[in-house]
Amino acid sequence: VLDKTGTITEGKPHVTDLVDVGRVPNLLQLAASLEKNSEHPLAAAIVAEAQKQNLSLLPVEDFVSEPGKGIRGRIKGKIYLAGNQKIIEENGVDIRALERPAARLAEEGKTPMFFAQDGQAIGIIAAADIIKPTSAQAVAEWKAMGIDVVMLTGDNERTAAAIQKQVGIPRVVAQVMPQDKEKEVR
């Protein structure tokens, strides 16, 4: 059983795409300001991209992290929510305008992160990690030895399937919360 991030991939994701629905002029700045308080590797990718673009980060109040789902906080009096599709939908945010781009990004092996402001979708920032050059060969060798190889990931099923195809992993368990990975192994 392999965890995707840092085992199959290098564990150093980078921002690849920004889909802005036009509600805010500075999606990356807002996202990085919120994500700077998170320890997630995807958050680090967003902050790094903002720094690369010399964007100043804004102060965040009332920051809350929900592991495996996302984060929330207040910036200049507005409530921001960032994370996977599940947390966005659980909070009643209409993401119909973002479903098609999110699906396309996931099918490309990228992880779409949704952002909302005061309950309205404002965009997606996608990130991707580089697959280690040895991953496909290692999986092929394990399969040749009769070892059943499984990848666990918190990513959505489309992103997981794209990585699965690139590496040749026979079975994937996607959308696994961090606290549930041990249970999946058993």
Which residues are covered by each model-predicted region?
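Cytosolic catalytic headpiece
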Residues: 1-186
